[in-house]
Design a protein with these regions (language model features):
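Feature marks short, highly hydrophobic, charge-poor N-terminal signal-anchor/signal peptide-like helices
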Residues: 1-10
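Transmembrane-cytosolic junction motif
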Residues: 18-39
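Membrane-cytosol interface motif
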Residues: 33-54
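Ferredoxin-reductase
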Residues: 129-216, 270-272
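Short, charged beta-turn/beta-strand-edge "cap" motif at the junction between a beta-strand
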Residues: 112, 124, 170-174, 221-226
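FNR/FR-type flavoprotein reductase catalytic core
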Residues: 200-293
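Iron-sulfur (Fe-S) cluster-binding segments and ferredoxin-like electron-carrier domains
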Residues: 53-64, 75-125
Length: 293
């Protein structure tokens, strides 16, 4: 009897939850809402009811987000100054106490139901959406590929050594985005090159490893705080391995393009010699620049 009561109660709660979701989606009308960004640097109007993340993307504000609204990547953090409603249980596990106190929220979980004021890092205002085509695919090891994107629109990218892009890939529940470091040097502005390890069952890496020359791709960027120290007096020590060599390669080539005499050490970590790649390129670079070890 108790089991039957539990089943009935659970069914009622599930039914009510589904009804509320449907009602909110199709019956709730929040009208026009205004979002004020960074104290008025940008101001845009939209129909309320969707997520803050969707609202930002629709207005070409491409903040980081890996899973498109599932609330588990923690990347889409913004500061809500006004109008975000109460903090949700789906957000609290991913926010520190200090973040919760300062109004940090997950944009994928916050619904736009009224006028809002938010803040995001200034640099995210300059993130762009790129359309490109695959111009090269090269197998580096048994599970790592180098994939080159030729930029179409816009046809140039401006990034700093160490930054990354977010590639859009088709997933079972819709489009997902995955972050990959840029391996091509900053002076190669018409391409973006990635070094990607195939993760068994991974949506993003499987998609990229299956790309062929001529395939269209879409991504946003650049993002990231992992950057080269631009003080020419600072000696650089680069440590990496596997797909983690992508930003290291970008950093090394960018260093010697800008500072011919700057000192740089490279330590390439691997399990076997078969896991080493780009060695010929680095050896050639060391012949041109004796400060590269």
């Amino acid at each position: 009897m108790n089991v039957m009561a539990l089943v009935v109660t659970t069914g009622v709660f599930v039914g009510l939850s589904v009804w509320f979701l449907i009602a909110e989606r199709y019956l709730a009308n929040y009208g026009k809402c205004t979002i004020k960004l960074n104290e008025g640097d940008k101001l845009f109007e939209l129909n309320g009811g969707g997520t803050l993340l969707s609202a930002l993307y629709e207005n070409k504000i491409f903040i980081p987000s890996a899973f498109g609204g599932k609330g588990s990547c923690r990347y889409c953090k913004v500061t809500v100054v006004e109008g975000g409603g109460p903090l949700l249980p789906t957000e609290t596990p991913y926010l520190t106490r200090a973040e919760r106190m300062s109004g940090v929220r997950l944009a994928c979980q916050v619904k736009v139901k009224q006028d809002m004021e938010i803040k995001i890092p200034e640099e995210l205002l300059y993130v762009q959406e790129f359309q490109a085509r695959v111009s090269g695919v090269k197998e580096l090891t048994r599970d790592i590929k180098e994939v080159t994107f030729e930029l179409i629109e816009p046809n140039e990218i401006s990034h700093r050594p160490g930054q990354y892009v977010q590639v859009r890939a088709p997933g079972p529940d819709g489009i997902v985005t995955r972050a990959y470091s840029i391996s091509s040097p900053v002076y190669e502005k018409n391409i973006v090159q990635l070094v990607v390890r195939l993760v068994p069952g991974g949506i993003g890496s499987t998609y990229i490893h299956n790309l062929k020359e001529g395939d269209p791709v879409s991504f946003t960027g650049p993002y990231g705080e992992f950057r080269l120290n631009e003080d020419p007096e600072v000696e650089n020590v680069c440590v990496g391995g596997g797909a983690g060599m992508a930003p290291i390669r970008c950093i090394i080539y960018s260093i010697f393009h800008r500072w011919l005499e700057r000192s740089c050490w490279l330590f390439f970590g691997c399990r076997t010699t078969k896991d080493i790649f780009y060695m010929e390129n680095y050896e050639e670079l060391s012949k041109k620049h004796t400060n590269f070890k």
